[in-house]
Amino acid sequence: MCDSKDNSGVSEKCGKKFTNYPLNTTPTSLNYNLPEISKKFYNLKNKYSRNGYGLSKTEFPSSIENCPSNEYSIMYDNKDPRFLIRFLLDDGRYIIADRDDGEVFDEAPTYLDNNNHPIISRHYTGEERQKFEQVGSGDYITGEQFFQFYTQNKTRVLSNCRALDSRTILLSTAKIFPIYPPASETQLTAFVNSSFYAAAIPQLPQTSLLENIPEPTSLDDSGVLPKDAVRAVKGSALLPCIIVHDPNLNNSDKMKFNTYYLLEYKEYWHQLWSQIIPAHQTVKIQERTGISEVVQNSMIEDLNMYIGADFGMYFYLRSSGFKEQITRGLNRPLSQTPTQLGERVEEMEYYNSNDLDVRYVKHALAREFTLKRVNGEIVKNWVAVDYRMAGIQSYPNAPITNPLTLTKHTIIRCENSYDGHIFKTPLIFKNGEVIVKTNEELIPKINQ
């Protein structure tokens, strides 16, 4: 842990400077510009009284109006300071999470008095009452930066008053009073960052180029299996641990040791089949692409998102507040349909019009998503094979003069109505050429 004199000064124990993220800034990608308050767990103190019930252990407050006297000792005696990280949402608001238990601040719907709500500790769900706007400015005398937290309706701010129990009611809401010069009520609603712990954040990988479809080198060369295929990193995103289900870690351990998870998006050429087709012969081959329902459900459970029928990303409530940052980092679009991508099974008839036997290997583009912990351990990965981008390589590729011809195409099964596209036949596969097809059906657009 490091201590700091103020928000922009030198860390006394660490001997290095750190800069606070400017307040009221436009949303930015988690990948490249994490604000300081999203990279550290800060202990918060009140600006004027310097007490921080449950948020810091400091001197007894000398005078606090509108707080019952029996709450003074509770605030003073608490020796369990809280260290809080603020996860930046797409809209510029924050989720305030506790390093100790992995829970987040939640504005409970019940009332205390004067239309004020208790702020409780709760598991993250993505609801509006867990989102807070941080606003503030600097003290022109001391240069110290302080701030308030606005609640969802922007008519209340977080207050240190009414903190009755360190694990039930953390804070409460209060009316908005001028932050400077301070009203007496502002003593408990204006906060400053104090000492901190660094968050556990993984390194982002460099992107790379996708290689050409691999070629067979002999009739006996069946090609590269999917598990051995060369991957190209096309994007990556940092996922706040509050949206990730890690079967091996509880919320507290996730927050401390994997504050952010790494989600990598890779592409590779997925072998669909490899076969020697005799001269002037037709063969039937079954091809399986897309993604299974079991794999989609796994992605929903662990990431609260899935791959749409248009191969874009679809987000549920828990992850939707971060969807712009995630898709920007992954270099993937938002899905324009609520329909999930399903598994597609087709029967193809191919004709070899050459005068010699030929080894043909067909590949389709695979889109792979891998979830990793800070230490690089893989939690899980999900693969969707895109039937719309495919190509065939052959051996020998000379002296053959005639390409492989798709003479008949039948869909055996497709798990959603948007996978019903049939290739027009005959379709010529030139050696090494990638055929790109898109659905002819109009997929209805939605607003995520």
UniProtKB/Swiss-Prot annotation:
Region of interest: Probable pore-forming domain: 226-407
Localisation: Spore, Perispore
Disulfide cysteine pairs (residue numbers): 67-161
Superkingdom to which the source organism belongs: Bacteria
Keywords assigned: Disulfide bond, Sporulation, Toxin, Virulence
Region described as Beta-trefoil domain: 19-200
An annotated GO BP: sporulation resulting in formation of a cellular spore
A single MF term (Gene Ontology): toxin activity
Post-translational modification: Processed by proteases extracted from mosquito larval gut.
Keyword Ribosomal protein in record: no
UniProt entry tagged with the keyword Secreted: no
Free-text note on domains in this protein's UniProt record: Has an N-terminal beta-trefoil domain and a C-terminal pore-forming domain. The trefoil domain has barrel and cap subdomains; the cap has 3 possible carbohydrate-binding modules while the barrel is involved in host cell receptor binding.
Self-association state and partner proteins as the record states: Forms a heterodimer with BinA.
Known function: Component of a binary toxin active against Culex and some Aedes mosquito larvae. This subunit is responsible for localized binding to specific regions of the host larval gut. The individual subunits are not toxic. BinAB and this subunit alone bind to the gastric caecum and posterior midgut of C.quinquefasciatus larvae. Binary toxin internalization into host gut cells requires both proteins. Does not bind to the midgut of Aedes aegypti. Toxic to Aedes atropalpus mosquito larvae; mortality towards both C.quinquefasciatus and A.atropalpus is maximal by 48 hours.
Record-stated family: Belongs to the toxin_10 family.
Name of the protein in question: Binary larvicide subunit BinB
Lineage: Bacteria, Bacillati, Bacillota, Bacilli, Bacillales
